A protein has these predicted regions:
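Residue-level signature of transmembrane alpha-helical entry/exit and packing/kink sites
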Residues: 1-4, 28-36, 64-69, 109-114, ...
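Alpha-helical transmembrane segments
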Residues: 1-13, 39, 70-76, 146-152
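Alpha-helical transmembrane segments in multi-pass membrane proteins
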Residues: 2-50, 97-108, 112
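Juxtamembrane "helix-exit" motif on the non-cytosolic side of transmembrane helices
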Residues: 13-23, 87, 158-164
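Membrane interface segments of multi-pass transport proteins and intramembrane proteases
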Residues: 18-29, 88-93, 137-147
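Juxtamembrane helix-loop-helix connectors linking adjacent transmembrane helices
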Residues: 23-27, 52-121
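Structural signal for the C-terminal ends of transmembrane alpha-helices
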Residues: 45-55, 187-190
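Transmembrane helix-loop-helix hairpins at the membrane interface
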Residues: 81, 110-213
């Protein structure tokens, strides 16, 4: 919940405070880099044992993991096309501000943004949403694990924009992120290693970015 709700709004005041203390300006691209490198470091420290275990599972099931990543990519893009058409029917007057924000950041600072989008964000998000949320709920109910992890993942990508724009209908765009959340959870569940969902997430982001460039 800290990553989902608190950090998006807490980081801006913290960087303003840092600028005053340092008497220097911190560019948005540098802020993003600091933010995600900090998240990466915290994630590695907290989940190092789990990451070691899932890395061994990946090495032991490399063939199955690679096949699952390929199947996941095909499913992701096939289902996404259907969902995209559905959301265009439901919210034709809404632009996906998450995508436009990333596009603007790539234009302003391509190297830093691509590093974040393709490497840092997939790693952090998969550890939290699939490793932590899905992994903990799966032992209680696989269905609940899929539903909750998918909804939280979708909520992450739209709620800030809905709040800033004060438009509750913007939450309808969560539908666009349910398919990725479902496929990524399946990749982890099917292979037993989080690296399947991390690499699938990274590959999907890389293809999405390259298609928009």
């Amino acid at each position: 919940m800290i990553y989902l709700v608190v950090l998006p709004f807490a980081t801006a005041p913290l960087f303003r405070l840092a600028e005053r203390l340092l008497d220097a300006s911190i560019s948005p691209s540098l802020q993003n880099a600091i933010y995600y490198y900090t998240l990466l470091a915290v994630t590695l420290i907290i989940f190092h044992s789990f990451l070691g275990h899932t890395t061994r599972n990946f090495a032991d099931n490399l063939g199955n993991a690679c096949k699952s990543i390929l199947v996941g990519l095909i499913a992701l893009y096939g289902l996404n096309e259907l969902v995209y058409r559905l959301t265009r029917m439901l919210v034709n007057n809404h632009t996906n501000l998450n995508d436009t924000t990333i596009s603007a950041q790539i234009h302003d600072a391509p190297r830093v943004t691509l590093l974040i989008v393709i490497f840092l964000a997939p790693f952090v998000e998969e550890v939290l949403f699939r490793g932590l949320v899905f992994g903990n709920l799966k032992s209680k109910s696989r269905t609940v694990a899929y539903v909750v992890s998918c909804l939280l993942f979708a909520l992450l990508h739209v709620w800030q924009f809905a709040v800033v724009r004060q438009d509750i209908t913007y939450f309808l765009l969560m539908v666009q992120y349910l398919v990725p959340g479902l496929v990524l959870a399946w990749a982890y569940d099917h292979t037993g290693t989080l690296w399947s969902s991390i690499l699938l997430h990274a590959a999907a982001n890389a293809l999405h970015v390259s298609a928009g460039m």
